[in-house]
């Protein structure tokens, strides 16, 4: 009986809320956020990590190339 009363009172509160309160919008936004997070974990998490790894490797190669060029310039200046 208490559960029935509670559900009736809560439904009345929801129905009496003004559209500006955006109660349903918050619930919908939360559901969408959870769905996107789950989708990212299932499909996109691996691709994002691979992209970060690839960027890190490219940065390392660029840094090595700059060091090699600097070394060659210093060696040429020394000769």
UniProtKB/Swiss-Prot annotation:
Keyword Metal-binding appears in the UniProt entry: no
Spans of biased composition, class Low complexity? 52-68
Keyword annotations = Amidation, Antibiotic, Antimicrobial, Antiviral protein, Fungicide, Immunity, Innate immunity, Secreted, Signal
Can the keyword rRNA-binding be found in this entry's annotation? Answer: no
The domain of life is Eukaryota
GO terms for biological process? Answer: defense response to bacterium; defense response to fungus; innate immune response; killing of cells of another organism; regulation of defense response to virus
| Predominant location | secreted
| Disordered, as annotated region | 45-68
**What compartments host this protein?**
Secreted
Please provide, in alphabetical order, the Gene Ontology terms of the cellular component aspect for this entry.
extracellular region
Provide the leader sequence positions: 1-22
User: By its UniProt entry, which InterPro entries does this protein fall under?
Assistant: Antimicrobial12
Q: Which residues carry this modification: Glycine amide?
A: 44
Which Pfam family is an annotated match for this chain, by its short name? Antimicrobial12
Its function, per the record, reads: Antimicrobial peptide with broad-spectrum activity against Gram-positive and Gram-negative bacteria as well as against a variety of fungi. Rapidly inactivates both channel catfish herpesvirus (ED(50)=4 uM) and frog virus 3 (ED(50)=13 uM) over a wide temperature range. Seems to disrupt the membranes by adopting an alpha helical conformation.
Family classification: Belongs to the pleurocidin family.
Official protein name in the record? Moronecidin
